[in-house]
């Protein structure tokens, strides 16, 4: 049975339940509350209050999302795009990616090792295949080129 979200208390309770499961961005939390029947006039003040109390934090959400998606083998470009689609500000995303402690070259090498067993491409076709795979995963082309040609990635 779904509760009716027609009071600030009900909205706050539902928002806190969602935040207890995992971090959410403001846009995502607003969308979920709307789907449950809450009105914007009631949602906004409650989300403001949760943010003031430190229970709703875009910075924590960004950090959590970056850690999760990079751990799943995705690079910074793919993560940036996914966060933009979730309604977060590009400047905040870029700052969070810069401040993340993810070693992108190491992460890319791990993904490449798992997929291609560490076999560098022997012909243009296999090089194109490996390049497409890593680019789709969101890793920068210059980093991909360095990995596939066997050059040192420690500059990243």
Swiss-Prot record:
Show the InterPro entries listed in the entry: RecX_HTH_1st, RecX_HTH_2nd, RecX_HTH_3rd, Regulatory_RecX, WH-like_DNA-bd_sf
Query: Which named protein is this?
Result: Regulatory protein RecX
Query: Keywords, A to Z?
Result: Cytoplasm
In terms of domain of life, where is this protein from?
A: Bacteria
Please indicate if the UniProt record lists Manganese as a keyword.
no
Query: What the protein does?
Result: Modulates RecA activity.
Taxonomic lineage of this organism?
Answer: Bacteria, Pseudomonadati, Pseudomonadota, Gammaproteobacteria, Pseudomonadales
What subcellular compartments does it reside in?
A: Cytoplasm
- Report the PANTHER family cross-referenced here: REGULATORY PROTEIN RECX FAMILY PROTEIN
Gene assigned in the entry: recX
Q: Which family does it belong to?
A: Belongs to the RecX family.
Biological processes per GO annotation: regulation of DNA repair
Q: Which GO terms describe its cellular component?
A: cytoplasm
């Amino acid at each position: 049975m779904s509760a009716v979200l027609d009071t600030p208390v009900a909205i706050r309770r539902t928002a806190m339940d969602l935040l207890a499961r995992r971090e959410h961005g403001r846009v995502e939390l607003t969308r979920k509350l709307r789907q449950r029947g809450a009105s914007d006039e009631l949602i906004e003040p409650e989300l403001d209050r949760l943010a003031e109390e430190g229970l709703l934090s875009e910075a924590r959400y960004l950090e959590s999302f970056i850690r999760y998606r990079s751990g799943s083998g995705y690079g910074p470009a793919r993560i940036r795009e996914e966060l933009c689609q979730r309604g977060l500000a590009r400047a905040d995303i870029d700052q969070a990616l810069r401040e993340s402690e993810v070693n992108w070259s190491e992460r890319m090498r791990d993904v490449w090792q798992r997929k291609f067993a560490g076999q560098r491409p022997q012909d243009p076709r296999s090089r194109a295949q490996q390049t497409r795979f890593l680019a789709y995963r969101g890793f920068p082309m210059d980093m991909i080129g360095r990995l596939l040609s066997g050059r040192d990635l420690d500059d990243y």
